[in-house]
Amino acid sequence: YAKEIQTPYYGEGLDGLLSARWQSLWGIVNGIDYEVWNPATDPQVYKNYSVDNFRQLKKINKIELQKECGLPQDENQFVIGIISRLTDQKGLDLVDRIMNDICCDGVQFIVLGTGDGKYENMFKYYQGIHPAKVSANIYYSDERSHKMYAGCDVMLVPSRFEPCGLTQLMALRYGTVPVVRETGGLADTVEAYNQFEG
């Protein structure tokens, strides 16, 4: 992110100054409280788990999350989550372009957040036409967010720009793969997939 804000696209008019003072510019990565965000002790998840047993117990969290979100319960469904402010910055127009493709066999989609009416309505629309595939939770709940980190397979973070972000860090902590747009702090905290090295 510190490099990005030295460009005209991300610099918001300060790119010249930031570029001139690049040696004094440092990026500081966000962190999370490991006592609060700990699937082994989190009182808000359905079933606690650790690195030793997450393969079995994460499935229980998925089934319970599906039930709570009004989706058919099936541990073999691939569950994608978004926990976000629903705004342009968060890249949700990119999700809109592929939403019908995402709602194919074997995939479910759960969103949690509030924001711009166009995105709130977009997710409500997709829930209406794909009720067995999409759960649009147009509000914020700390408890539901913990349950989503514990129950989803993937957390989608398609932000157009992101100084750092926390969603990807929480997802990693819960063994939920963050799929992020390679920008800002997302690029700083999530290693890019390499098809040759895994």
What do these predicted ranges mean?
Residues Y1-G198:
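Catalytic cores of nucleotide-sugar-dependent glycosyltransferases that transfer UDP/GDP/TDP-activated
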